[in-house]
A protein has these predicted regions:
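A generic structural motif
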Residues: 49, 116, 124, 154-155
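Active-site region of chymotrypsin-like
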Residues: 1-49, 75, 83, 87-92
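A structural signal for beta-strand boundary/capping segments at domain termini and interdomain linkers
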Residues: 147-149
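Terminal peptide-recognition signature
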Residues: 2, 21, 35, 40, ...
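C-terminal cap/linker of serine protease catalytic domains
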Residues: 38-86, 126, 144, 158-160
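Conserved PDZ fold ligand-binding element
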Residues: 35-44, 99-122
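PDZ domains, with a preference for the canonical peptide-binding region formed by the helix
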Residues: 112-140
Length: 160
């Protein structure tokens, strides 16, 4: 049974939102097991299981992305967002980092990455997870009462 999406558990943050599913204790799938919906579509693969029957799944979209982009690097923007905030306000920037070089400022509200709407921290995680890192980014923020767009930002790349 689908419960929700989570970007962290306790002090552990994930590189993207994982699907949280609850199963009856006797029907908990093992780690590595694919899970399907009622229409037999892949939902994800089980990454972890708790004693209470809660599972975390790697979403099918992530599996597909990694299969089609095996060389993709992990993209980093060089910014800090409050993981618990309902608004994606840029709390800090790494000096000389991608967003700082693109003119983004502390206090800006992140609203789009390459035309993907950003409403919260989880949206930002997912948007950056599915980037390949080989193309410049377009970032849109709200600064005061203005919408500001910065194009041509080259992200930092790390191995996945």
């Amino acid at each position: 049974i689908y419960v929700g999406m989570e970007h962290s558990i306790g002090d552990t943050s994930f590189p993207l939102r994982l699907i949280r599913a609850q199963f009856p204790k006797l029907a908990v799938p093992p780690i590595g097991q694919p899970c399907y919906d009622s229409e037999n579509r892949l939902v994800g693969i089980v990454l972890g299981v708790s004693r209470k029957g809660t599972c975390h799944l790697l979403p099918a979209r992530a599996i597909s992305f990694l299969a089609t982009h095996p060389e993709a690097k992990r993209v980093r923007l060089g910014c800090l967002l409050d993981i618990n905030s309902s608004t994606p306000v840029i709390e800090g920037l790494i000096n000389g980092g991608p967003l700082a070089r693109g003119g983004i400022q502390t206090g800006d509200i992140l609203i789009n990455i390459n035309d993907t709407p950003i409403r919260n921290y989880g949206d930002m995680l997912d948007a950056t997870y599915y980037l390949t890192g080989d193309k410049p980014l377009s970032i849109e923020v709200i600064r005061g009462t203005q919408v500001v767009t910065s194009k041509g930002i080259l992200p930092t790349q790390d191995p996945r």
